[in-house]
Regions:
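C-terminal structural segments of small proteins and small subunits
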Residues: 39, 43-62
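Short Lys/Arg-enriched helix C-cap and helix-to-coil transition segments
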Residues: 33-38
Length: 63
């Protein structure tokens, strides 16, 4: 199990910080895990699952 910091999540998803937090507020992106008083991270597996779901949505729209 690996925890990703915000920059790594941004690199994996090609999304900006504000977009990631917008999707979190809309319950369409995995919620971060508190790591300390001013630090959060995301489970790599949850971010990867989110990416795979976007791919599945794309593929379903072409079917």
């Amino acid at each position: 199990m690996k925890i990703l910091k915000l920059k790594e999540v941004m690199d994996c998803t090609a999304l900006g910080r504000s977009t990631i937090y917008k999707y979190i507020s809309e319950d369409t992106f995995p919620k971060p895990i508190p790591l300390g008083s001013r630090s959060v991270g995301w489970l790599q597996s949850e971010v990867e699952d989110w990416i795979l779901a976007r791919i599945a949505e794309r593929d379903d729209s072409f079917a």
